[in-house]
Amino acid sequence: MAEITSAKAMARTVRVSPRKTRLVLDLIRGKKVADAIAILKFTPNKAARVIEKTLNSAIANAENNFGLEKANLVVSETFANEGPTMKRFRPRAKGSASPINKRTTHVTVVVSEK
């Protein structure tokens, strides 16, 4: 049987838009996990906090569940899929209302041994 060399973590229904989340994910894709954590610590973005927690969870999964070494791990895959959208209305002039879409994201981070 083949040896497992990757681990995954997901954060579902995060209250950040997928478009903004993808901008941060592009910064860490393909980097070593230590470099990725350093990048996320200095990224002033709400999505960066969530991605950092998800990345740490993926690292913990790799170490505890599959016995992988943290020093050898690389962020191999990252993606942000659209979650459920909360629909709200903003009151406007003359008794009308405009729709507001509060978007959510499903963040997935996969780390693997290089």
From Swiss-Prot:
Gene3D superfamilies: Ribosomal protein L22/L17
Record keywords: Ribonucleoprotein, Ribosomal protein, RNA-binding, rRNA-binding
Source species, domain of life: Bacteria
Similarity remark: Belongs to the universal ribosomal protein uL22 family.
PANTHER family with a match to the protein in the record: CHLOROPLAST 50S RIBOSOMAL PROTEIN L22-RELATED (PTHR13501), LARGE RIBOSOMAL SUBUNIT PROTEIN UL22M (PTHR13501:SF8)
Subunit details: Part of the 50S ribosomal subunit.
Protein name as annotated: Large ribosomal subunit protein uL22
